[in-house]
């Protein structure tokens, strides 16, 4: 596969931002072995925004011939008070429920879970020279910048935090360089850490990204954050700035179960959640159900998506692109309930292999049900 085809695969949905395409092309051209990574806190049930969005992108990267890695961020989860801040519980969940759930998610999105390397953060954090990299990065970033970056943990600027949380952004950047990562992958909410990585790349003395004597910058790949199903706190949305802010605030959240569909939800749970979803008639700009359709159902276009309706309501209708679907919805030709029902049935079918896996192997999910879920 030539470089341009690889770049097209990397850019396809659900990619929302690539920092930068020019640098990605340069990395391919210099011939450095390409290593992807995406890091996850271990914090609760896996929802579609985690499993399917990351799984879809991992599938694309594999098709482009890139080695893929999932970094199970146990220490980072401990710092950020996940699962009650109990490191032993976090590690147990990471290596059972989370690992198996991500494998199944990758599989349903067309990737090969056996080609994904899973690394527990403890395995590298316990090496002394990792902390040299953390200090090296920290010496090249101001305290004010680190404090602004705590939003990568789902924390607000100005929120009262313990000191450990200020180390977190430097650790996240160190993870990239210590593992020799060329493509750092995350949701759009992790952008601040990745921008720091790009900016400090050529200043580092310990574990820089280097190939044949040249210090290189990693590429940052950010996928779309699926909107949560709940109604936003402010409606209607007046300004573009408000809209951008809301998109990040209203992402799917495991701490708000009705905002999210989890990868192992039952068919009835999926139907109930979609029925309750915020989906105002004719609204296409901020509509979680249309958002899910665009990034899950219409990830590959053209694709056939049929909405079944009684003849008296217009009968069945088939769409091949998300734009066709949005157009009919905006014009009032498609009722919100018909859209919700069709998306629910699509997800039920898509997630069937995941449900079947956890029915045959219930132990990881049972363990997860026993532990405290935090945001």
From Swiss-Prot:
One of its GO terms (cellular component) is cytoplasm. Coiled coil: none annotated. It holds the Pfam family tRNA-synt_1b. Its EC number is 6.1.1.1. One of its GO terms (biological process) is tyrosyl-tRNA aminoacylation. Catalyzes the attachment of tyrosine to tRNA(Tyr) in a two-step reaction: tyrosine is first activated by ATP to form Tyr-AMP and then transferred to the acceptor end of tRNA(Tyr). It is an enzyme of class 6 (ligase). PANTHER family: TYROSINE--TRNA LIGASE, CYTOPLASMIC, TYROSINE-TRNA LIGASE. InterPro entries: aa-tRNA-synth_Ic, Rossmann-like_a/b/a_fold, Tyr-tRNA-ligase_4, Tyr-tRNA-ligase_arc/euk-type, Tyr-tRNA_synthase. The lineage of its organism: Archaea, Methanobacteriati, Methanobacteriota, Thermococci, Thermococcales. Its main location: cytoplasm. It catalyses: tRNA(Tyr) + L-tyrosine + ATP = L-tyrosyl-tRNA(Tyr) + AMP + diphosphate + H(+). The gene is tyrS. It is found in: Cytoplasm. It comes from Thermococcus gammatolerans (strain DSM 15229 / JCM 11827 / EJ3). A motif ('KMSKS' region) lies at residues 251-255. ATP binds at residue 254. GO terms for molecular function: ATP binding; tyrosine-tRNA ligase activity. This is Tyrosine--tRNA ligase. Belongs to the class-I aminoacyl-tRNA synthetase family. TyrS type 4 subfamily. Keywords: Aminoacyl-tRNA synthetase, ATP-binding, Cytoplasm, Ligase, Nucleotide-binding, Protein biosynthesis. Homodimer.
